[in-house]
Amino acid sequence: MDQDFFDTVKNYFRTKYIVFEFKNYSDRITQKEIFTTEKYLYEKALRKVAIIISRSGADAHALWAAKGSLRENGKLILCLSDQDLVEMLDMKDRGELPAEFLSAMLDDLLMHLEK
C-alpha cells in the first residue's frame, strides 16, 4: 500500500491528524470556508492539514486563501469535489492507489505556490 501522501503530510507538515470537513453546498466553497477551517488547524495539537470535501469544489478565491494559509502559516488545506472522489474511486477500481490523486494535488499546489 502506497503511503506516500500520508507519509509526506506526517513528515513534512509535522501532523498526526488530518481534519476532514464536509460541505453540502450546491455552489463552490469560498474563502470564508477556508478561513473557518484554518482555525481548526493547530500545530501544538498536531493537526496542520485539512481536506475539505464539497459538492462543486472550491472557487478561485478559496484556492487563493488555501495557498495563503500554506505560505503564511504552514497549514495545508486541500479542496476536493464530488468529481474528485469519483476519480479516486475509479482509480481504486483500476487497481491504482487513490492516495496518488492526493499526492498529485499536493505536488501541484506546492509547485505553483508563490512567494
Predicted region positions:
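Mixed-charge (Asp/Glu-Lys/Arg
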Residues: M1-K115
